[in-house]
């Protein structure tokens, strides 16, 4: 099968590699977003997909508008039987969608119709889900609303972060893409309409979502810290300074500790032996890793040793 692959970020790279290595699939070109200025030097940086495509010796096309007529002509000249889209970053119009004979196939990082939208991985962890997965679908003109081909469930472990889950889903999703294209070509791929009644949306997140509300439950705080790690990161304030929180563990307070009149966000314990324990809306969390603005990420015992944090201090 001759295909065009469209993708941009790290999530799309395993899929590109696995399709490239599949004997029955030929990638005629890779389409990705234009190079962007990044970092302190504001240097132009290629997308991760562009970097991998060059490594594999594949033809790369870049555009800021996939639906521009001259670009559609370029795509048509490639005669793709399918267009595979993984986190490309642009919405495909009707002319592009109708171009390949087998259609446009998308890989999405959730079990559709749950978590349509831009941030399904973050939302699954933040919401405390135990299971998520990946879905392949035939694309239509909506956002993640096309007919489902295959789904693959993936367990969310308590030690998972958005980063680790991202990598798992990207790899498993790459395998599912290979199966999907092979079965489409054989004429045995299923097709199922999405249930609008079960649909939910994972809207794009920004840095503000990482601000910790200590009045929430310990489990909610635990899930938020995991769900925004490594980006955009959970944070609070301490003595007027930004404090990033990289990992916490929920704790059950004893009856005696619960009898103390403590506010949410108050430091219950700050010692090298016990680390840093903070009151939450229902119990407490133990901070494992944290980072003061402009400093390195360190463990709680080292933070206690290096900074004057003490019982009764208020976070947030």
Swiss-Prot record:
Q: What class of enzyme is it?
A: transferase
The taxonomy runs:
Bacteria, Bacillati, Bacillota, Clostridia, Halanaerobiales
Q: What is its EC number?
A: 2.1.2.9
| GO CC annotations, alphabetized | cytosol
Q: Does the keyword Amino-acid biosynthesis apply?
A: no
Keyword terms, alphabetized: Protein biosynthesis, Transferase
Query: What is the recorded function of this protein according to its Swiss-Prot or TrEMBL entry?
Result: Attaches a formyl group to the free amino group of methionyl-tRNA(fMet). The formyl group appears to play a dual role in the initiator identity of N-formylmethionyl-tRNA by promoting its recognition by IF2 and preventing the misappropriation of this tRNA by the elongation apparatus.
Matching entries from InterPro entries are given as: Fmt, Formyl_trans_C, Formyl_transf_N, Formyl_transf_N_sf, Formyl_transferase-like_C_sf, Met-tRNA-FMT_C, Met-tRNA-FMT_N
Q: Which residues form the signal peptide?
A: none
Which Gene Ontology MF annotations are present?
methionyl-tRNA formyltransferase activity
UniProt-annotated binding residues for (6S)-5,6,7,8-tetrahydrofolate: 110-113
Q: What is the name of the protein in this document?
A: Methionyl-tRNA formyltransferase
Q: Which organism is it from?
A: Halothermothrix orenii (strain H 168 / OCM 544 / DSM 9562)
NCBIfam families linked to this entry: fmt
Pfam families, A to Z: Formyl_trans_C (PF02911), Formyl_trans_N (PF00551)
Quote the gene name from the UniProt entry. fmt
Similarity remark: Belongs to the Fmt family.
Report the catalytic activity. L-methionyl-tRNA(fMet) + (6R)-10-formyltetrahydrofolate = N-formyl-L-methionyl-tRNA(fMet) + (6S)-5,6,7,8-tetrahydrofolate + H(+)
């Amino acid at each position: 099968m001759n295909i065009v692959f469209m993708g941009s970020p790290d999530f799309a790279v395993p899929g590109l590699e696995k399709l490239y290595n599949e004997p029955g699939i030929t990638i005629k070109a890779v389409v990705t977003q234009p190079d962007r200025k990044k970092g302190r030097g504001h240097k132009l940086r290629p997308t991760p997909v562009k970097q991998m495509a060059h490594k594999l010796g594949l033809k790369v096309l870049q555009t800021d508008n996939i639906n521009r007529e001259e670009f559609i002509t370029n795509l048509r000249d490639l005669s793709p039987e399918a267009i595979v889209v993984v986190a490309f970053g642009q919405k495909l119009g009707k002319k592009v969608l109708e171009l390949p004979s087998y259609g446009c196939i998308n890989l999405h990082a959730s079990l559709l119709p749950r978590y349509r939208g831009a941030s399904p991985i973050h939302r699954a962890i933040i919401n405390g889900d135990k299971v998520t997965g990946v879905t392949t679908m035939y694309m239509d003109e909506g956002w993640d609303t096309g007919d489902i081909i295959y789904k693959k469930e993936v367990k969310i472990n308590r030690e998972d972060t958005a980063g680790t889950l991202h990598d798992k889903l990207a790899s498993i999703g790459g395998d599912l893409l290979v199966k999907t294209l092979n079965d489409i070509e054989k004429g045995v791929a299923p097709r199922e309409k999405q249930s609008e009644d079960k649909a939910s949306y994972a809207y794009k997140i920004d840095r503000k979502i990482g601000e910790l509300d200590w009045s929430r439950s310990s489990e909610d705080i635990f899930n938020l810290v995991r769900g925004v790690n490594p980006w955009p990161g959970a944070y609070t304030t301490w003595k007027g300074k930004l404090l990033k929180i990289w990992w916490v563990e929920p704790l059950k307070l004893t009856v005696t500790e619960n009898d103390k009149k403590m506010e949410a966000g108050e430091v219950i314990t700050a010692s090298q032996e016990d680390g840093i324990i903070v009151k939450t809306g229902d119990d407490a969390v133990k901070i494992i890793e944290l980072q003061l603005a402009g400093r390195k990420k360190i463990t709680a015992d080292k933070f206690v040793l290096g900074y004057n944090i003490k019982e009764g201090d208020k976070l947030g």
